[in-house]
Amino acid sequence: FGMWCIMCSPLLIGCDMNTIPDFSLKLLKNKELIALNQDVLGLQAHVVQHENESYVLVKDIEQKRGLTRAVALYNPSDQPCDFIVPFETLELGGEVKVRDLIKQEDLGKMKGEIRQTVQPHSVLICKVKAEKRLEPVCYEAEWAYLPCYDDLGKKSKPIVYVPDADCSGKMKISRLGGREENFA
């Protein structure tokens, strides 16, 4: 459910509400997760870190390029995963307040990185608020905002994909057009 919320997916319940377990019902009624899903920006999270079978996803909430973001530490594997996520990867700097949205509890203020263990087939969804926002150092094809995209080849310099081992999908987009609306 948390992954649906951070991805702004439609929230539908397809079960018998009379027999739903209390844990599941509590999760489906979690106001903080629902607020994340219904955030005014309506953005989907994108992958910023991928190691072995684990993923770190992030998105702006409340304000584009603001100090508050949502983060998912997603472990689809069969083993516990120890996450170490530098705040620079999340484009955040200074002291960062971290809140677990699933458990609805504050994890405190952190500096430098988030260190958490996530159990198999689980996710930790956090709201993070930083003292400052850092400039991104990597733009990836998976989440680039491309309103001027042209796949018909009619532009003089069409967008091209370029291999890049530092990108989670191992590819990035080049020649975005140099216009502000092309950047995430």
Language model: regions and residue ranges:
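Aromatic/acidic polysaccharide-binding cleft in carbohydrate-active enzymes
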Residues: 1-38
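Substrate-binding groove of N-acetylhexosamine-processing glycoside hydrolases
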Residues: 11, 109, 117-119
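Extracytoplasmic
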Residues: 92-98, 112, 118, 122-184
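Surface beta-strand/loop "capping" patches
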Residues: 45-68, 137-153
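C-terminal accessory region downstream of the catalytic core in glycan-modifying enzymes
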Residues: 88-107
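Carbohydrate-binding surface patches
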Residues: 4-7, 12-14, 50-92, 121
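Composition- and surface-driven signal marking solvent-exposed, interaction-prone regions
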Residues: 17-20, 83-88, 110-115
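Extracellular low-complexity, O-glycosylation-prone Ser/Thr/Pro/Gly-rich "stalks"
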Residues: 37-45
